């Protein structure tokens, strides 16, 4: 596995791979590597010849009103996991290399930002999308893989790449789960044994709401209440909301034929629930018949 901190070097490496006729994949992570990240690499290896991991755990990006602190991650641990998974190129973006002077360019996505549920303020999300756009520009033509667990981020990245006509395709991969249905996340390690035992209720509640929709429920709040009723005895729900999957627009009705309903019938139920002080997020997709 080749490791580099220089964006010019990783660009040169990937250009050489493409020139040799090989398909390139990119997987991005902020550190805290777990089985969910490795599953992205596994999918990338199925579809491409060369896999590059962009590890952003060392990166601190600043903006006019403050900064986003670097993650406190174990680089050596993550490197070992990715090398064992068969990653070819391991790129560690460094601020001094990427941003030798303050950046004045930021992505604005007002049409989507106004729909975000339970996410950080818009300025933070614009910074995040800008960072991903920067990394895709460095990677060049590629397939890039993100997990569906963070659905809102995934959709924003996909829309950004499409709107800018980047020579990259953002692919969503199914959420990797524990045998009991809990979405794999670094946050799971913060749960007490009792909280971890209760955590499967989140995905079970979302599944129950999806089943209610499949059985004919078309009121979004009523569908959410199916999940909330299961969760309140064991956790503190922050939100459960139904959105149009491709636009993140919150829905009141789930009927595609009704005004304001999902235009293509594709709905995503998004949830954030606190077990103690630890918030867990998850989501599930539902297809509502359009006829």
UniProtKB/Swiss-Prot annotation:
Q: What subcellular compartments does it reside in? A: Cytoplasm
- Name the reaction it catalyses: (R)-pantoate + beta-alanine + ATP = (R)-pantothenate + AMP + diphosphate + H(+)
Q: Keywords on this record? A: ATP-binding, Cytoplasm, Ligase, Nucleotide-binding, Pantothenate biosynthesis
Q: Which residues bind ATP?
A: 147-150, 184-187
Which sites are catalytic?
Answer: 37 (proton donor)
Q: List GO BP terms, alphabetically.
A: pantothenate biosynthetic process
Q: Which Pfam family, just one, is annotated for this protein?
A: Pantoate_ligase
InterPro entries the record matches = Pantoate_ligase, Pantoate_ligase_C, Rossmann-like_a/b/a_fold
EC numbers for this chain: 6.3.2.1
Protein's name according to its UniProt entry: Pantothenate synthetase 1
Source organism of the structure: Frankia alni (strain DSM 45986 / CECT 9034 / ACN14a)
